[in-house]
């Protein structure tokens, strides 16, 4: 009897162990399925990736700004040259330095004028090519529309209405005066013969 009881208890313990193992296995499988459904890009990974991309973009932007600033300084140094030492220079030397700066500035202005003319010519050529391409495609170039504020349109309409209102009032006033003048004129003409008859009597 004791052996049977001990065997039954051992069986119960084993069943409990097996049941707990099955529960743990089931829980792990469910978690694994949830992870598979989420995929590789979890919200945490997406957030980290966004931060990395922003950091990378900021670094690239900073490098580009530094590169442009370096090129600008280099071009300024090339075009303007190093500053002249004016300490102890006499009038003749100062005149020579000023003339050198003046000639250099005139040359830069001439180069600038040539570049502007070249830009205008290139823009004209690009415009002509665009017209030819649109003609071949059977399309028309859309005109550049001027941006107008909606408040300006409303204000213009109100001004127009006010002008029309004032014009009508003026017309009414003029008509009243005309009628009054005609009435006065008719009364004067009507009173003329009667007054003459009264005077004759």
From Swiss-Prot:
Tell me a Gene Ontology molecular-function term this record carries: actin binding
UniProt record similarity statement: Belongs to the troponin I family.
Give the matching InterPro entries: Troponin, Troponin_I, Troponin_sf
Troponin T-interaction as annotated region, ranges: 108-117
Q: Which GO terms describe its biological process?
A: muscle contraction
Keyword set includes S-adenosyl-L-methionine: no
Q: What else is known?
A: There is a 30 residue long N-terminal tail that does not occur in skeletal muscle TnI's, but is present in cardiac muscle TnI's.
Among the entry's GO cellular component annotations, what is one? troponin complex
- Protein known as: Troponin I
Region feature (Disordered): 1-45, 182-201
Q: Locations of Basic and acidic residues compositional bias?
A: 1-33
Which keywords does the record carry?
Answer: Acetylation, Actin-binding, Methylation
Pfam families assigned: Troponin
What job does the chain carry out?
Troponin I is the actomyosin ATPase inhibitory subunit present in the thin filament regulatory complex.
The N-acetylalanine modification is found at 1
- N6,N6,N6-trimethyllysine modification sites? 142, 146
Q: Where is this region: Actin-binding?
A: 135-148
